[in-house]
UniProtKB/Swiss-Prot annotation:
Listed name of the protein: Probable glycine dehydrogenase (decarboxylating) subunit 2
Chain positions covered by the region annotation Disordered: 1-24
Family label: Belongs to the GcvP family. C-terminal subunit subfamily.
Gene that produces this protein: gcvPB
GO MF annotation: an example: glycine binding
GO biological process: glycine decarboxylation via glycine cleavage system
Enzyme Commission (EC) number: 1.4.4.2
Reactions it catalyzes: N(6)-[(R)-lipoyl]-L-lysyl-[glycine-cleavage complex H protein] + glycine + H(+) = N(6)-[(R)-S(8)-aminomethyldihydrolipoyl]-L-lysyl-[glycine-cleavage complex H protein] + CO2
Keyword terms, alphabetized: Oxidoreductase, Pyridoxal phosphate
Cofactor list: pyridoxal 5'-phosphate
InterPro entries: Aminotrans_V_dom (IPR000192), GcvPB (IPR023012), GDC-P_C (IPR049316), GDC_P (IPR020581), PyrdxlP-dep_Trfase (IPR015424), PyrdxlP-dep_Trfase_major (IPR015421), PyrdxlP-dep_Trfase_small (IPR015422)
Assembly and interaction partners: The glycine cleavage system is composed of four proteins: P, T, L and H. In this organism, the P 'protein' is a heterodimer of two subunits.
Species for this entry: Thiobacillus denitrificans (strain ATCC 25259 / T1)
GO cellular-component term (any): cytosol
Domain of life assignment: Bacteria
Length: 483
């Protein structure tokens, strides 16, 4: 039921805010609304009950364990939210003079420096407004670098078959041809295939380390040498940065550019369509091409860099410098943790993943890469279970909802059949992990003894099996009031 379904003509709530607008007589007649907007007419109690009910139907970090692999669904401390919302930070207009925003700009400069430190990069720009936006900026800088050298023949980006789907999409948007290389039996990049793929046409390699398979690329030193010797650059997808936060730095591995998903690693909000933040870090060779604005420190005076400071910049990613409220949350989180706290994030995230992986192995679940240690997430494959019972990974995931757990990522990465990609993050307790293992064991037993029970799940939610194809093909995102 939508809020509009509660609407009744003339029903109103007391205004919570003062009226604004005043006299509109100075507006041209063609810009003035002639009809009342199609807004619901409801009481305050209707609104409170409606949205409270909706919140109770949602799965969220506040209420359930959320082991959504490669999404790092950690708990975001409330302090980060409350401190970042202080009006002293957010009241500044983005077009106001730098002199009037020294506190905010100083905070943003410190965040840039902390991100540089934790990633080992030479420079950071926080202009991109989402992870994919930062990814686009990173590949655009690779292109600008090669174009500046007159190396127009480099029009190929290499992408492993375990990469995030945004990687080939971004490369294509930036005008590159994508060349896919396989993963070997241990989940690592196939070095022989990489050597065969590089050449004078290679602009770069896009890599996630640890990978989406949950394993660390132990041959990263050799990988970066192969790519750099061929004249290409190395791109780091920061999706799994939480696993190595400050312990191992992409810059030290030889990466030339990285985008960071602050919603995964630095305690900013997930989902909802935004706002977001996707800062990019670069090695020395890409410093001239960073997107603007970024914050400069001129002998204690903080200011936003412009085209005059970076004439080779790829330009502006948005009207202003990212989303201020999101960046402030990341700043508070980084200050609360400090360098040692960030190290503990990586340690506990890895510990939780390996504990959960070991417990599920003991319970009889098959691991996609049983000889490898989990970095932050791992893959369970249910292929044997499906062959024996007909219960698929999707069925298993739906049944988990009945036990109060959000399902892990299903059917991704694509190269592992009937897979569950599980990432517990550092903020979950051992008791929570043990409860999840118990639910997994119970569902496995149900699949083996009463498979139809699992195939019919979920039973406890207001909606059950949705038509995903219809939802994707027949978009209906707007409310249309009845005539």
């Amino acid at each position: 039921m939508l809020i509009f379904d509660h609407s009744r003509p003339g029903r109103t709530a007391a205004a919570q805010l003062p009226a604004t607008g005043g006299d509109l007589g100075d507006l041209p007649a063609e810009l003035r609304r002639k009809d009342a907007p199609a807004l619901p007419e409801v009481s305050e109690l209707d609104v409170v009950r409606h949205y409270t009910r909706l919140s109770q139907k949602n799965f969220s970090i506040d209420t359930q364990f959320y082991p959504l692999g490669s999404c790092t669904m950690k708990y975001n401390p409330r302090a980060c939210n409350s401190l970042a919302m202080l009006p002293q930070f957010l009241a500044r207009h983005p077009a106001s003079p730098d002199e009037t925003g020294q506190g905010f700009l100083a905070s943003m400069f410190e965040l840039q420096e902390m991100l540089k430190d934790v990633t080992g990069m030479a420079g950071v720009s926080m202009a991109p407004m989402a992870g994919a936006h930062g990814e686009f900026a990173g590949v655009a800088m690779i292109r600008a670098y090669h174009d500046a050298k007159g190396d127009a023949a480099r029009r190929e980006i290499i992408v492993p078959d375990a990469a995030h789907g945004t990687n080939p999409a971004t490369a294509t948007m930036c005008g590159y041809t994508v060349k896919e290389i396989p993963t070997d039996a241990t989940g690592a990049v196939d070095l022989a295939a990489l050597k065969a793929a590089v050449g004078p046409q290679t602009a770069g390699l896009m890599l996630t380390n640890p990978s989406t398979l949950g394993v660390f690329e132990k041959t990263i030193a050799e990988i970066q040498k192969i790519v750099h010797d061929a004249g290409g650059l190395l791109y780091y997808d920061g999706a799994n940065l939480n696993a190595i936060l400050g312990k191992v730095r992409p810059g030290d591995m030889g990466f030339d550019v990285i985008h960071m998903n602050l919603h995964k690693t630095f305690s900013t909000p997930h989902g909802g369509g935004g706002p977001g933040a996707g800062p990019v870090g670069v090695s020395g060779r890409l410093l001239p091409f960073m997107p603007i604005p970024l914050v400069l420190n001129d002998n204690g005076f903080y200011r936003l860099a412009t085209e005059a400071d970076l004439p080779q910049s790829i330009g502006r990613m948005s009207a202003n410098m990212g989303n201020a409220g999101v960046l402030m949350r990341a700043y508070v989180y980084a200050r609360l943790l400090g360098r040692e706290g960030m190290h503990r994030v990586a340690e506990y995230a890895t510990l939780n993943a390996n504990y959960l992986m070991a417990k599920l192995r003991e319970a009889g679940f098959d691991l996609a890469y049983p000889t490898r240690r989990a970095s932050h997430e791992f893959i369970v494959t249910l292929k044997k279970l499906k062959d024996a019972t007909g219960v698929s990974a999707m069925d298993f995931a739906k049944r988990l909802l009945d036990y109060g757990y959000h399902a892990p990522t299903t059917y991704f990465p694509l190269l592992v059949p009937e897979c569950l990609l599980i990432e517990p993050t550092e903020t979950e307790s051992r008791e929570t992990l043990d409860g999840f293992v118990d639910a997994m064991k119970t569902i496995k037993h149900e699949a083996e003894t009463n498979p139809d029970l699992v195939k019919g799940a979920p039973y406890t939610l207001p909606v059950r099996r949705l038509d995903d194809v219809k939802a994707a093909r027949e978009l209906d995102l707007a409310y249309k009031p009845a005539a």
